[in-house]
Design a protein with these regions (language model features):
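M16 family metallopeptidases and their MPP-like homologs
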Residues: 40, 45-71, 85-130, 162-186, ...
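Bacterial N-terminal signal peptides
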Residues: 6-18
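Non-catalytic, conformational "gating/processing" segments within enzyme and secreted inhibitor domains
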Residues: 197-229, 431-432
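His/Glu-based metal-binding/catalytic segments typifying zinc-dependent metallopeptidases
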Residues: 152, 169, 238-302, 410
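Mature N-terminal segment immediately following signal peptide/propeptide cleavage
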Residues: 22-51
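Short, polar/flexible loop-turn hinges at active-site or ligand-entry regions and domain interfaces
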Residues: 78-81, 130-138, 362-363
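Positively charged n-region of N-terminal signal peptides that target proteins for export
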Residues: 1-4
Length: 440
């Protein structure tokens, strides 16, 4: 514990005491075919985390085939002409590594963590499946069953899965963010060899991919390996990311309420329209990050102290700001109420608290503490290879490397007036959706 605290204090002093232009100090190179290489050296351990990031997510899927990006993620483990489906993961495990993948609304990433000496092996495997993925119609049919089962676990058999899907649609009437990344059953049923293969050939091309490597290596070491295996892969024309623009909800609030016997406590949620880093009043992006930290970043905030510790109205409160997405999403506030707490009493207390922020803003101490906590979190992210990969996935959502590198400077520069203005933009109107989850 003493070592943890001393490390925490060291990083806190470092982050608060100097300009942060250069958080990760990535080494960057782009091949002639458009493939970008980003290397973040980290000598803490002789391992590397390798991420192959594709700038395509389920919000880019064609309407009859929503979720096909997630399905293709599954099929990417089916092998190539030289590496069988069963062999791909076995090779990595045999060399002491681990591999995983994730598909979001805005990107798909394939990650492997392994000893540095096997870096070339992984890049060879990734280049092979970027260009030579091989699967059959029968494997498509079989994998559909796997995804149907995954959907049952996530949605039908999850206490809040269906409520979450209704919430997505309430927040996004027309935008594809309103459809869950896994898709609906009728979408999954429509997948075929042709549609999956076309999706692969459309988006999985070097000029739509970024190789991100964090760990004990350097660009000088990585570049010739990437050139050897990826350099001859041809680039292709990438379609524009065509998404429906979400219209104004014209003051409509949709309320979702669910009773579930597997839920033992009342959970309340409010979601407000908010600009993001790329669309709308983007000047509010960094102040909204700070506001979210002030409201529900951790159990030491004034917001938490008032509602949980002083008034004992809730067991927990938190906030979320989804400003990093490619298109605007929401600013959310959620709470798990104390046992036997009256919902109306809590809502009144929350409403009064938010009105106070809208009228008076937040305090200098709250601003200082929020910045300190955000920058301390960043210090520990920087030391982790996998967390570093996660940060750089924002490149698929429209961020630049410069924005990532100057993130801490932008946070440091946020003023009380900017937080107050951002709060008025996000919280003055009625929420676009609320969701109350009750015991059955």
């Amino acid at each position: 514990m003493k070592r943890f605290l001393s490390t925490f204090v060291f990083y806190l002093t470092l982050f608060m005491g100097q300009s942060m232009a250069g958080i990760f100090n990535p080494e960057v190179h782009t091949l002639p075919n458009g493939l970008q290489i980003i290397v973040v050296p980290n000598d803490i351990a002789p391992i590397v985390s390798i991420g192959i990031l594709y700038k395509v997510g389920t919000a880019d899927d064609p309407l009859p085939l929503m979720g096909i990006s997630h399905f293709l993620e599954h099929m990417m483990f089916k092998g190539t002409k030289t590496v069988s489906a069963s062999e791909f993961k076995k090779i990595i495990l045999r060399h002491g590594g681990s591999t995983n993948a994730a598909t979001s609304f805005d990107y798909t990433i394939y990650e492997t963590e392994i000893a540095k000496e096997y870096l070339e092996l992984i890049l060879k495997l990734e280049a092979d499946r970027m260009a030579n993925l091989s699967f059959t119609e029968e494997e498509i049919k079989s994998e559909k069953d796997v995804v149907f089962e995954e959907r049952r676990m996530r949605v039908e058999n999850h206490p809040f899965g269906q409520a979450y899907e209704v919430l997505l649609k309430a927040l996004s009437w027309y935008h594809p963010y309103g459809i869950p990344p896994i898709g609906y059953p009728h979408h999954i049923q429509n997948y075929s060899f042709e549609t999956v293969h076309n999706h692969y050939k459309t988006w999985y091309t070097p000029n739509n991919a970024i190789i991100i490597i964090a760990g004990k290596t350097s660009l000088a070491e990585v570049k010739p390996i990437v050139e050897r295996y990826f350099g001859d892969l041809p680039s292709r024309t990438i379609p524009a990311r065509q998404r429906f623009t979400e219209p104004t909800h014209q003051g409509i609030t949709q309320h979702i309420e669910q009773k579930n016997p597997r839920n033992s406590l009342i959970m309340l949620n409010w979601y407000y329209n908010a600009p993001n880093h790329r669309v709308g009043e983007t000047k509010h992006y960094y102040p909204l990050i700070v506001l979210s930290q002030i409201l529900g970043g951790n159990s030491t905030t004034e917001f938490y102290r008032f509602l949980v510790e002083e008034k004992k109205l809730a067991l927990s409160v938190r906030s979320s700001y989804e400003g990093d997405s490619y298109d605007p999403r929401s600013f959310g506030i959620s709470a798990t109420l104390s046992p036997n707490m009256d919902v109306a009493v809590f809502k009144k207390a929350l409403s009064d608290y938010l009105k106070g922020i809208l009228e008076k803003g937040v305090s200098e101490e709250e601003l200082r503490k929020a910045k300190r906590d955000l920058l301390a979190q960043l210090a520990f992210i920087r030391d982790g290879n996998n967390s570093t990969l996660s940060v750089f996935t924002s490149l698929a959502s429209g961020f630049s490397i410069e924005q990532i590198e100057k993130w801490a400077d932008y946070i440091q520069a946020v003023t009380l007036e900017e937080v107050h203005a951002a709060a008025k933009v996000a919280l003055s109107d009625l929420p676009v959706a609320t969701m109350d989850l009750h015991p059955g």
